[in-house]
UniProtKB/Swiss-Prot annotation:
Keywords: Hydrolase. Its EC number is 3.1.2.-. InterPro entries: Acyl-CoA_thioesterase_PaaI, HotDog_dom_sf, PaaD, PAAI_dom, Thioestr_dom. This is Putative esterase DR_2321. It comes from Deinococcus radiodurans (strain ATCC 13939 / DSM 20539 / JCM 16871 / CCUG 27074 / LMG 4051 / NBRC 15346 / NCIMB 9279 / VKM B-1422 / R1). One of its GO terms (molecular function) is acyl-CoA hydrolase activity. Belongs to the thioesterase PaaI family.
Length: 146
Protein backbone atom coordinates (compact mmCIF):
# COMPACT_ATOMS: atom_id res chain seq x y z
CA UNK A 1 0.00 0.00 0.00
CA UNK A 2 1.59 3.35 -1.02
CA UNK A 3 1.80 6.03 1.66
CA UNK A 4 2.29 9.73 0.79
CA UNK A 5 5.30 11.44 2.33
CA UNK A 6 5.28 15.04 3.50
CA UNK A 7 7.02 17.06 0.81
CA UNK A 8 5.96 14.70 -1.97
CA UNK A 9 6.82 11.17 -2.93
CA UNK A 10 5.59 7.80 -1.79
CA UNK A 11 6.92 4.71 -0.08
CA UNK A 12 5.48 1.24 -0.07
CA UNK A 13 4.54 -0.51 3.17
CA UNK A 14 5.12 -4.24 3.14
CA UNK A 15 3.91 -6.84 5.59
CA UNK A 16 6.22 -7.41 8.56
CA UNK A 17 8.25 -10.62 8.52
CA UNK A 18 6.62 -13.65 10.11
CA UNK A 19 7.28 -13.87 13.84
CA UNK A 20 9.55 -16.62 15.03
CA UNK A 21 8.12 -18.63 17.93
CA UNK A 22 9.40 -17.15 21.21
CA UNK A 23 11.60 -20.08 22.32
CA UNK A 24 13.66 -19.79 19.11
CA UNK A 25 13.77 -15.99 19.00
CA UNK A 26 15.73 -13.57 21.12
CA UNK A 27 13.61 -12.10 23.86
CA UNK A 28 13.56 -8.38 24.60
CA UNK A 29 15.75 -9.02 27.66
CA UNK A 30 18.31 -10.88 25.53
CA UNK A 31 18.38 -8.07 22.96
CA UNK A 32 19.24 -5.65 25.79
CA UNK A 33 21.93 -8.03 27.11
CA UNK A 34 20.24 -8.95 30.39
CA UNK A 35 21.34 -11.94 32.44
CA UNK A 36 19.36 -13.58 35.25
CA UNK A 37 21.80 -14.05 38.15
CA UNK A 38 19.39 -15.50 40.74
CA UNK A 39 15.73 -16.44 40.55
CA UNK A 40 13.85 -17.39 43.69
CA UNK A 41 10.53 -16.17 45.16
CA UNK A 42 12.48 -14.38 47.93
CA UNK A 43 15.23 -12.76 45.84
CA UNK A 44 15.75 -12.33 42.12
CA UNK A 45 18.69 -10.53 40.52
CA UNK A 46 19.01 -9.51 36.86
CA UNK A 47 22.02 -7.68 35.39
CA UNK A 48 23.10 -5.83 32.27
CA UNK A 49 26.02 -3.70 31.15
CA UNK A 50 25.18 -0.25 29.77
CA UNK A 51 26.26 -0.03 26.13
CA UNK A 52 26.43 2.93 23.76
CA UNK A 53 23.09 1.86 22.26
CA UNK A 54 21.47 2.29 25.70
CA UNK A 55 22.48 5.92 26.20
CA UNK A 56 20.23 8.96 26.10
CA UNK A 57 21.01 12.41 24.65
CA UNK A 58 23.00 13.30 27.79
CA UNK A 59 25.34 10.32 27.42
CA UNK A 60 23.92 8.47 30.42
CA UNK A 61 21.82 5.30 30.56
CA UNK A 62 18.36 5.86 29.10
CA UNK A 63 15.56 5.73 31.66
CA UNK A 64 13.77 3.17 29.50
CA UNK A 65 16.78 0.86 29.74
CA UNK A 66 16.85 1.12 33.52
CA UNK A 67 13.07 0.62 33.69
CA UNK A 68 13.35 -2.43 31.41
CA UNK A 69 15.98 -3.99 33.70
CA UNK A 70 13.79 -3.49 36.77
CA UNK A 71 10.72 -4.73 34.90
CA UNK A 72 12.52 -7.93 33.86
CA UNK A 73 13.43 -8.68 37.49
CA UNK A 74 9.80 -7.90 38.41
CA UNK A 75 8.49 -10.28 35.73
CA UNK A 76 10.84 -13.09 36.77
CA UNK A 77 10.18 -12.94 40.52
CA UNK A 78 6.42 -12.51 40.17
CA UNK A 79 6.01 -15.48 37.79
CA UNK A 80 8.11 -18.05 39.65
CA UNK A 81 5.25 -19.53 41.68
CA UNK A 82 2.18 -18.02 39.95
CA UNK A 83 0.90 -16.67 36.65
CA UNK A 84 1.18 -12.92 37.05
CA UNK A 85 0.58 -9.78 35.00
CA UNK A 86 1.51 -6.25 35.99
CA UNK A 87 -1.32 -4.15 37.39
CA UNK A 88 0.71 -1.08 38.43
CA UNK A 89 4.33 0.05 38.41
CA UNK A 90 6.19 3.12 39.61
CA UNK A 91 9.85 4.06 39.29
CA UNK A 92 11.93 6.80 40.89
CA UNK A 93 15.35 7.66 39.46
CA UNK A 94 18.07 8.87 41.87
CA UNK A 95 21.41 8.66 40.04
CA UNK A 96 22.67 8.33 36.46
CA UNK A 97 24.54 5.32 35.04
CA UNK A 98 27.30 5.55 32.45
CA UNK A 99 28.39 3.45 29.49
CA UNK A 100 30.28 0.34 30.58
CA UNK A 101 28.72 0.19 34.04
CA UNK A 102 27.13 -3.06 35.17
CA UNK A 103 23.67 -2.57 36.65
CA UNK A 104 21.96 -5.14 38.86
CA UNK A 105 18.22 -5.15 39.60
CA UNK A 106 17.52 -6.76 42.98
CA UNK A 107 13.88 -7.81 43.41
CA UNK A 108 12.27 -8.77 46.71
CA UNK A 109 8.64 -9.27 47.71
CA UNK A 110 6.95 -6.59 49.81
CA UNK A 111 3.68 -8.53 50.16
CA UNK A 112 2.42 -11.63 48.37
CA UNK A 113 -1.26 -12.44 48.67
CA UNK A 114 -3.55 -14.86 46.90
CA UNK A 115 -4.55 -12.51 44.04
CA UNK A 116 -2.18 -9.53 44.37
CA UNK A 117 1.53 -9.21 45.08
CA UNK A 118 3.78 -6.17 45.40
CA UNK A 119 7.53 -6.24 44.78
CA UNK A 120 10.39 -3.83 45.44
CA UNK A 121 13.18 -3.69 42.86
CA UNK A 122 16.35 -1.70 43.51
CA UNK A 123 18.56 -0.99 40.49
CA UNK A 124 22.13 -0.83 41.78
CA UNK A 125 25.48 0.14 40.33
CA UNK A 126 27.20 -3.25 40.45
CA UNK A 127 26.48 -6.06 42.89
CA UNK A 128 26.51 -4.03 46.11
CA UNK A 129 26.73 -0.46 44.79
CA UNK A 130 24.53 2.54 45.38
CA UNK A 131 20.85 2.47 44.47
CA UNK A 132 20.31 4.31 41.17
CA UNK A 133 16.56 3.76 40.92
CA UNK A 134 13.70 2.25 42.88
CA UNK A 135 10.84 0.36 41.17
CA UNK A 136 7.66 -0.73 42.94
CA UNK A 137 5.30 -3.02 41.11
CA UNK A 138 2.05 -4.83 41.82
CA UNK A 139 0.83 -7.87 39.91
CA UNK A 140 -2.48 -9.60 39.59
CA UNK A 141 -1.74 -13.28 40.14
CA UNK A 142 -3.30 -16.71 40.07
CA UNK A 143 -2.04 -20.23 40.63
CA UNK A 144 -0.14 -21.76 37.74
CA UNK A 145 -2.15 -24.22 35.70
CA UNK A 146 -0.63 -27.72 35.63
Amino acid sequence: MPIALAGGGFFRVSAPPARTPYPEAMSYAEVLGMTILDASPDLTRVALTVTEAGLNMHGTAHGGLIFSLADEAFAVISNLDAQAVAAETHMSFFRAAREGERLVAVATPERVGRTLATYRIEVRRGEEGEVLALFLGTVSRREKQS
